[in-house]
Amino acid sequence: MAASVVKTPKCPRRGSVKDVAQNAPRTAPTSSKEANWNWWLLLATVFLVTFATRFYKVTEPDHICWDETHFGKMGSWYINRTFFFDVHPPLGKMLIGLSGYLTGYNGTFPFEKPGDKYNETRYQGMRYFCTTLGALIMPMGFDTVYDLTRSHEAALLAAAYLIFDVGLLTLNQYILLDPILLFFMMASVWGMVKVSKSTASGGSYGLRWWLWLFLTGTMLSCTISVKFVGLFVVLLVGLHTATELWLILGDLGQPILETVKQLACRAITLIVWPVLLYILFFYIHLSVLNRSGNGDGFYSSAFQSRLIGNSLYNASMPRDVAYGSLVTIKNHKTGGGYLHSHHHLYPKGSGARQQQVTTYTHKDENNKWLIRPHNKPGPPKGKVQILRHGDLVRLTHMATRRNLHSHNEPAPMTKKHLQVTGYGELGLGDANDVWRVLIVGGKVNETVHTVTSRLKFIHLLQNCALTSSGKQLPKWGFEQQEVSCNPNVRDKNSQWNVEDNEHKLMPSVSFSVYAPGFFARFLESHAVMLQGNAGLKPKEGEVTSRPWQWPINYRGQFFSGSSYRIYLLGNPLIWWSNLVFLALFVTVFLCNAVVQQRRAGFARSAAQNQAQVPDSETVAQDEESEHSTTDICSCCTPAKEIVPKAVPSGSPEAPNPAQSLRAAAWLFLGWMLHYLPFWAMGRVLYFHHYFPALIFNSLLTGVMYNYILRVLPKWIHHVILGLVLSILVYSFAAFSPLAYGMSGPLANEPNSTMYNLKWLSTWEF
């Protein structure tokens, strides 16, 4: 395609954005129409190939695969309006439940474990929904790269890298949060680029500009409402927006009021609007899930009082706690469990071989304790004796009839604390069973109240506080939480409250007055989610991974381990070539930065040695030095530029190499933001956590491919692209059984059809 040299309009730092739009080079209408047809043809091809590959065998296997057991179950709970606890925000699970409901699923399938057959269950609608969102990532990726490069070849290659990755295909075909998350993340980046493009072409404050701004804000809110890792794309869009505002501020052709207007518009659409949407999603979540479920115990007693069917809902219990009360005692920290015991003993090497005492987050008969005087078998018969601040008590576990006990033995997990056990027979024990009850901030003789009083239990002899350390016990403790006696009696983890209170002789009162409002529950939900997320631990036999393994495709992850096997693994040719283009970008970017810095230094040196009027060569060098790699303005161009004539009408001219490099820099930043933070995370990590970063890497590959091959004639460019696409298609066909299903011998057996594809010993398919 012929090219011509055109003079570029002034940078908006010397003239207005409108000047740039008015002075933009005019292109031939015929060529523009041809480019538009090419764009639509390629986009249609991307759509067809994407949907063909994604929906092929989407309902197979017809059994639960991997985390479908969690998110399918949660979709069922939304349909049944049953409250549950999860570490992720609610939007993705609400959409899964909604898609199931609209396609005829009734919410009764148990989703117990991977491998269970769906049988007559109408699960297909939920898979179709997740797959559809996953399939829309590729067209958006195509258009995003096209807007960044104005290159059909770059856009097509980036889309091909997304389409023909069998790992992304596998992740898109099941009832999971990941395709929903990736869709909203990609839509956020797409909107960000569209806003930048519209602003650069002088379209600010037009209808299209506003629509793209609101779309971007909506997608940002949806991304972080699916998983908290959506914060990374929020940060990316925020940095990009701040950069654009900074460049608008430096546009001397515009009054400073223009910057204020732009800032206000973006604050409304990219901050206020997403926050309101985020709150709305939680309002819907808490309104729909209004029935008691197995996740109640993760939340405070007051929170539970809003759940229909919970023992605290419209509860009528004694207001005061008395001797002889049968109570449950809940740790007052966020996500705290119930004081719990059972017949099992601590194992050898974990302190005295006495009965285990733990905290447990689920309601259970083993959570009930009887409050007794410290020096009598019980209160006087027929009389009520109120429990007060400073009283000495024994707590007897009702199911086992052993007393809450501590002694001078180290706790099993927190060695600086003392062990807490169940001790004695039928309520008879020793002096180590005596605890002093203190109300936090209480006064002498102040009454202990149900739910509202925050309590400390101080051991009389050891002077330590009953504490939930938050540490998880091993298998011998059923992975419940350790309870210990902490010498630091001021530790906030040593605060408790009485949740359930039964006493035959005391009048009951309604507790509905203590039910919290929406914002109190909204804040508590976040505290519980964040704490749960940070404390995630791998289950026994579960395959986890570390961040260094992800970019090199070191090990995959089984989605289905039955005779019909599904294995999550990236297309190695795509993943490893992505790393090559990452390295190329870093190399080119650094070299370009060095060259620009040297040119700037040369220009300054030459200017000092010139006469008062510099010659034209020095001026040209000075102008060229302005276009450094740190200038990210989407509408700045060098003094001279080669521009293809065939550009779609109404769109900005093709970016020059420096602009392409700056576009690649933003994609590289997106990759870093979605990858590097995982190195600092202490929680359990899995291979699928890398896929948001993979999308940025694949888009970067398309941009860098165009940057590197831009100097070649078009026909050579097309030949190379054809060869690359052929290799991608072939590799996809070879590795597609990983996504579509494998049967027969494993790949490490010579008679396996996958034998020659096991390139790394760590691949387990």
Swiss-Prot record:
Its EC number is 2.4.1.109. CDD domains: beta-trefoil_MIR_POMT2. At the cellular blastoderm stage, expression accumulates in the ventrally located mesoderm primordium. At germ band extension, mesoderm expression is seen as stripes of strong expression. A very strong signal is also detected in the invaginating gut. As the germ band retracts, mesodermal expression decays and becomes restricted to somatic muscle precursors. It is a multi-pass membrane protein. Residues 318-374, 384-440, 445-501 form the MIR domain. GO terms for molecular function: dolichyl-phosphate-mannose-protein mannosyltransferase activity. Residues 1-31 are annotated as: Disordered. Disruption phenotype: Death during development, the few adult escapers exhibit clockwise rotation of the abdomen. Keywords: Developmental protein, Endoplasmic reticulum, Glycoprotein, Glycosyltransferase, Membrane, Repeat, Transferase, Transmembrane, Transmembrane helix. GO terms for biological process: muscle attachment; muscle organ development; protein O-linked mannosylation; sarcomere organization; somatic muscle development. Signal peptide: none annotated. One of its GO terms (cellular component) is endoplasmic reticulum membrane. It is an enzyme of class 2 (transferase). Its main location: endoplasmic reticulum. Glycans are attached at N80, N106, N119, N290, N314, N445, N751. It comes from the Eukaryota. The chain crosses the membrane at residues 35-55, 128-148, 175-195, 206-226, 228-248, 268-288, 566-586, 667-687, 689-709, 719-739. InterPro entries: GlyclTrfase_39-like, Glyco_trans_39/83, MIR_dom_sf, MIR_motif, PMT_4TMC. It is found in: Endoplasmic reticulum membrane. Pathway: Protein modification; protein glycosylation. It catalyses: a di-trans,poly-cis-dolichyl beta-D-mannosyl phosphate + L-seryl-[protein] = 3-O-(alpha-D-mannosyl)-L-seryl-[protein] + a di-trans,poly-cis-dolichyl phosphate + H(+); a di-trans,poly-cis-dolichyl beta-D-mannosyl phosphate + L-threonyl-[protein] = 3-O-(alpha-D-mannosyl)-L-threonyl-[protein] + a di-trans,poly-cis-dolichyl phosphate + H(+). The keyword 4Fe-4S does not apply. Belongs to the glycosyltransferase 39 family. Interacts with Rt/POMT1. Rt/POMT1 and tw/POMT2 function as a protein O-mannosyltransferase in association with each other to generate and maintain normal muscle development. This is Protein O-mannosyl-transferase 2. It comes from Drosophila melanogaster (Fruit fly). The gene is tw.
